[in-house]
Swiss-Prot record:
Belongs to the adenylate kinase family. The gene is adk. One of its GO terms (molecular function) is ATP binding. GO terms for biological process: AMP salvage. This is Adenylate kinase. Pfam families: ADK (PF00406), ADK_lid (PF05191). Its main location: cytoplasm. It comes from Borrelia garinii subsp. bavariensis (strain ATCC BAA-2496 / DSM 23469 / PBi) (Borreliella bavariensis). Monomer.
Length: 211
């Protein structure tokens, strides 16, 4: 089974993806993780992606589609998977339908103010990559990781002005996509402002529902 998680940055897609992946043995394919992996490894695409995200812009379709397709090809044929953050527009959706038809589409709904608060407070450990939040998951010592004592940092694209740019572009690009899936009755909306356990229950219900 394939699941597609749609929603703005900070809507909880990544957190829920990891929970579902661990409990139900799904592969979690996150475009954000794939981008960061390429940036970290300084691949040709990674260098290009880094310049784009630091400006608060969305990565072009041709790059995103290639990275996602390559990842899916590396997965066993009958394994379950979650696509987190892909597709993001009609072009990507059409590409997805060509090589992965009949996936279930789940859209995470959340207001912009809550997204900005969640992401502007996010801090990441430079050493072990654990994620904390100064508002919801603060460390015992300011700026220091609770796990490995490494230094924490804030991603450039998590700063408020950059977030506003990202959210504006997200809305412009994904509105037609949401309408596209709504018209063909494939869209399952989930309130992402509630507690994680509540979101999880709703996702499982959708997973069990027949197409």
């Amino acid at each position: 089974m394939g699941l597609v998680f749609l929603g703005p940055p900070g809507s909880g897609k990544g957190t829920i993806s990891k929970i579902i992946s661990n409990e139900f043995k799904y592969h979690h394919i996150s475009t954000g993780d794939l981008f960061r992996e390429n940036i970290l490894n300084s691949t040709t695409l990674g260098k290009e992606i880094k310049k784009i995200v630091e400006k608060g812009e969305l990565v072009p379709d041709q790059i995103t589609i290639k990275i996602v397709k390559d990842k899916i090809k590396a997965i066993k044929k009958n394994d379950n998977f979650i696509l987190d953050g892909f597709p993001r527009n009609i072009c990507q959706a059409e590409a997805l339908d060509k090589f992965l038809p009949n996936v279930k589409i789940i859209n995470f709904l959340i207001n912009e103010e809550l997204v900005i608060k969640r992401l502007s407070g996010r801090r990441i450990c430079k050493s072990c990559n654990n994620i904390f939040n100064i508002y919801t998951l603060a460390t015992k010592k300011n700026g220091i990781c609770d796990v490995c004592k490494g230094d924490l940092y804030q991603r450039e694209d998590d700063k408020e002005e950059c977030l506003k740019t990202r959210l504006k572009e997200y809305k412009l690009q994904t509105k037609p996509l949401i309408e596209f899936y709504s018209k063909c009755s494939r869209l399952n909306n989930v309130d992402a402002s509630v507690e994680i356990d509540e979101i999880k229950k709703k996702i499982i219900k959708i997973m069990l529902k027949k197409n």
